[in-house]
Amino acid sequence: MTYQRVLLKLSGEALGEPGTGHGIDPDAVRLIARQVAKVARLGVEIAIVVGGGNILRGAEFSRLGGHRANADYMGMLGTVINGLALSDAIEDQGLETRVLTAIE
């Protein structure tokens, strides 16, 4: 069975440092980008949804006393940061990317 389009959901922790899942590990990002490029070169269209838990978890920040709405926005910004990091790495593989967000 072959697919023309796939959706890849990545936890933000998949982009993080080994052992902790925090921050952004350039080696992890490059590895994922190479794997995505390999599949894309087979003619598969790939949409990627990436989390931001490696940067900040809004619920955790809120529990520590931050305003919930701000905490949620901070978490969403983490997803954008991850998306941009992954986008750069995929473009370095010669593919075209687009980062989309609902943040206003």
Question: How would you describe each model-predicted region?
Answer:
Residues 1-104:
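Nucleotide/pyrophosphate-binding catalytic subdomain
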